[in-house]
Amino acid sequence: PHNGKPLPLDSREMLAFLAYLKWINGFTEKHKEYKGEKPLEIEFIDRKESSENGKILYTQHCVRCHGANGEGQMQFDDVTYVYPPLWGKEGYQPGSSMHRVIKQAQWLKANMPHDSATWQNPVLTDAEAFDIAAFVNDDAIHSRPNPKTLDYPNAVEKAIDYGVPPHADTFSASAHKYGPYKPIIKYWKEKGLHPKY
């Protein structure tokens, strides 16, 4: 894990990324939308996400691959991961898009558990995906590497589920991180702003 540091251009990982991008680019026409391009739609729930319920769901659906302490599972080479760590010193940073509850919930619904969920047939409900994302991203119980404080110099460009202030509205940092999101989206639209998530 490089934790936000650029990969060396000639590294095995960078060459793998480039090979994959070249390969996948061969399946789509340029400047044309394609199935799976956008995140799976997810219905916002009318309550704050529950980290407590997310912990129970994490134990049911996620522990076997990502570990009880979010440590992930290393490959045999002890350098890379089969299943990535979700928090701790090797986890993703606060500035990562996966550290945003809405973004992670969309991804979880479409992809997890990896051996049973598909984009067409999700396993998790919308509420379950939101609660697991809230638990995994709960900074009160999970540490992250290299905390950042000024990721977005312009608050209007910040995603509404990014929990670090300042924000372009009067909602609390907790509301931005854990919802409910419908009132925030409504407020932004009423002000003529485009909410990002």
Model segments located where?
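A short secondary-structure junction motif
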Residues: 1, 24, 28, 68-72, ...
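Extracytoplasmic electron-transfer domains, predominantly the class I c-type cytochrome c fold
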Residues: 1-6, 17, 81-143
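N-terminal export/targeting leaders of redox proteins
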Residues: 2-18, 22-26, 143-197
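Amphipathic alpha-helical surface "interface" segments used
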Residues: 8-18, 36-52, 125-134, 153-164
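The canonical Cys-X-X-Cys-His
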Residues: 17, 54-73, 86, 132-136
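Electrostatic cytochrome c docking/interface patches
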Residues: 25-59, 64, 73
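Short acidic alpha-helical/loop segments enriched in Asp/Glu that coordinate divalent cations
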Residues: 32-36, 67-84, 118-122, 147-150
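A short glycine-/small-residue-rich loop at the edge of a beta-strand within enzyme catalytic domains
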Residues: 45, 49, 56, 77, ...
